[in-house]
Structure formats: C-alpha cells, structure tokens
C-alpha cells in the first residue's frame, strides 16, 4: 500500500478550505466480513446484515438530469487534486448545475445501486484488494476555496472506479452531502445525499460519485487504483461549470 500517495493533504487559502487524511486505521480484506463501528471496521464471523445483503424497494430521489459528453484523459499521474490521476471533462450545455439534496435512505440510494448501512451492520466489500480504512476531514469552505479554484482543485468533478467506498460520519456535527449518479446514452442523473449520523453510504465499484461536498470528519474507505475515470464539469467553451447543492 502506497500510503504517501493515499494520504490526502489539500489546503486552500481559507482556514476551512482543506481535505486531510488524519489517520489510516487499517485495512479491510476481500472475502471477509466486518462490523461497522465509529472506531473502525471490526473483523467478525457473523452473518452479513440482511439490509446489506438484499436489494431494497426503490424510491426515486429528487434529482437533476442533463445530457453530457464524457471525455476521458490518458494521464494517470496523481495530482494534488486527485490521488488517482489526471482528470478529463464532462462537457454539458450549462454554466451552472444545482443538484437536489435529499436525506439518504435505503430506498432512495437503491435507485442508484448504493446502500445505506448503519453502525453495527455486518458487511463485506466487493473487492479483490485490501482497502484502507481512514479518518478524513473536510473543511466547510473546501468546495468554494479549493475545489472550484482552477489552479488548486481544478473544478467540481464526478468519477467512477473499480473499488468500493464507505463514508460514515464520526459525529453529529458533520454536514454536506455525497453526489451519486448514473448515466445512459449520455443522459446523466445526479442526486446529493445527506448522511445521517449513525449511518453510512456504501458505494459499489463503478458507480458515479463525488465526495468533495461532504463537510466534517468521516470514516472513509477509499483506495488507489489504475482503473478509474474522473471528469470535471465544463461548458462547451471549456469554462468550469458552477456546481452547487440545493434543496429538493
């Protein structure tokens, strides 16, 4: 595991414009089961929780739909803004994008194929590699004073990769939301999910997502992989699209 590449330490010019990996607690291994706790993932022989194992009834969340062209990049060199590598472009015919925000539930996450988990649940990760378990903090002005600054974060993005994620608030002060979406024939559907304390979002491999709009301290499982695609929202004249989260 390349911890130097894995650890994030992004800071802007504002006191709250940061995303920092505070700690790597350990790893979760393929084919093993873990109990979710605020102190990490605990190895167990218990059965996988039913709410994680079975698909839930689907409820369509508030969302935004638009057409876009996904333009990949061949650059796989990691940058300060993206530990995976370079970013391509998602070209859309808009200069602003407001993604509706909803509270995450098992039913509305199922619309995209993600899963709601809660403290105490037993889960198994869809992976063939060990995945680091981290504590990561995101400042309240990270989006405005780092992510959206072209020579720092490079602009709001969406991505997919072949590794799963877990995002779990570590206390009640967390806020913000996680963007999750899907696409078909260049038509994109996105929603922003608030994560209630005591719960988390499991994002399976290859699902469209972005976690930069979360705020606070989270237990996050993420990894470095060569099989990914990250794109920045841009208009046809290559200007950054102003992406924001709004009430549904």
Predicted regions and their residues:
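Well-ordered alpha/beta subsegment
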Residues: 202, 206-212
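Active-site region of the double-stranded beta-helix
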Residues: 1-197, 210-248
